[in-house]
Amino acid sequence: MAKQYKDLINNNRLWASEKKEKEPNYFSRLSLAQRPPFLYIGCSDSRMPLDTYTNTEPGELFVHRNIANQVSLTDINFLSVLEYAVNVLKVQHIIVCGHYHCGGIAAAYHGKVKGLVGNWTNPIRDLVLNYNSELNAIEDLDKRLDLLSELNVIQQVENLYKTNIVQHALQKCHAGFQIHAWVLDISTGLIKELELPMEAWKNKGLIPETVEEDPGKNENHEAHGV
């Protein structure tokens, strides 16, 4: 574990040396271009590096992270990432991943966070109000916050479907294009896939009726740099 700044550099040298020893062309191949099939939208929490939990390598995940894994429809940073991932990289899967024991979720629930972070997590406060009865029905606070983490992920997926970028991709029927909702349990290291209310969203007109539950599994990608 890196405890000092110099440890980061030393660890990098060791890691790069080991990689090159095992695969001499690893970095030259990696430098040519990227072609990730996945866009990962996750929390900024230092315990949330998805490549570690999924045993993936550099070049496999296009990543956007922020506090409490928000999909903000007014965040130019996020929307630029989404546009590039969908329209240029042609990712087939978008994964919104939250986690249990999330500090942002807990702070928003208790209403104690202020400043810019308070503004950023206001949408979670709205979830607390909208699902007040469901949350209060759970006596254990930790389990209540776990449910809020799950509700937050599902809400962010719904926000994704509201974007013109995703709507355009759905209308063009991009082969294999799917959006997934995950929650990571840090206490076990395991990922939980959440069920999405697809039929309800179709009834609301959020998702075209022509969109299938499993739109295909075409794994072909062109490589692009950024």
Predicted regions and their residues:
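Glycine/charged-rich beta-loop-alpha catalytic/anionic-binding loops adjacent to active sites
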Residues: 58-69
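N-terminal short beta-loop-beta anion/metal-coordinating cradle
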Residues: 19-60
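Divalent-metal-activated hydrolytic enzyme cores
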Residues: 1-36, 68-89, 104-226
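Short beta-strand segments
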Residues: 41-43, 65, 95-99, 180-185
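Short acidic/polar active-site loop segments enriched in Thr and Asp
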Residues: 92
